Amino acid sequence: MEISSRSGIMILFATIAVCTLVLFPLLQYVAERDPQLSAYDDDWNDISNFRKGLENSEDSNYNVSAVLSNPGVLDEISDPSSTLFVIVGTESPYSSLELEILARYMESGGSILVFGDYDYSNTIAELFAIEFVKHRLWDQNYRDNLSLIPTTAIVDGESYNILLNEPVAIRDLGSQYVNLWSQGFEWNKQIFISTSKNSWIDSDDDGLITPEDEVSGPQGFAVGMRCEMKSPEGNQLGTAVFVSDSSLPINMMWNEDRNSDFLLKLIESMIGTEGEVLFDESRHTQESFGASLFQSALGFYFLLAGDTLITQV
């Protein structure tokens, strides 16, 4: 029996309704977990306030966008020197090819800003012979509970009181494990955030101070490090900045102390008051229905908003 066009349309809408009301909630329920640390979602553990702060600042003019698939598009940027690639919480490792692209991008003058801790951020940090120490960092100078550590960040000579949430230490490895740089490129490391002298790394993960733990010296442990790149000719190139607390820019922490002022000033110190800011959204999706749906919805957001979408398939 043939189905009329009218009946076909009714069946189509009925199918869509069933999928929307029944199948989608079920599939969403079995997804591993919701995406987090996204610049385009408004949950407490996302970073949309960070993005909005950059977009709405009266003191700057940034074009803010996102990379949805992989950093390969960095090879196509026409002016890397005015571009900042922001990575918050690396939930999947960068491949060797992606690291080579990041190295070329920085050799061309591009900058990166990495917020990491217990994740895969070391895949990038090792390019600069540093690492995120994946043991709990304790400090006797804490606030309210042991997880919240107040400290001071120095940006362009100005001090900012900031509040960290379960940071880890950054260790200088001295020698390089991963070298993808062209010959002659150099960088200068500078610590701009550190803990108090009364801090220690819980090396045995028992929550106590024991002989096995690493106690800080008078300078505390580094939790913020800046790497300034120089060409073989000595010309200043891009900057790589590492902050060992992926929760610092999340919405819940945005208004704590001077966190928001610090983050906006940090961006300005890297690319000035104008330029491109690209959030790497490719590290916040998984191979699941819920993650795929989130990424598709994010693509529709750019399409409907008329914003520039930077993506690589």
Language model feature labels by segment:
Residues 1-313:
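Short, surface-exposed patches at the edges or C-terminal ends of soluble domains, predominantly
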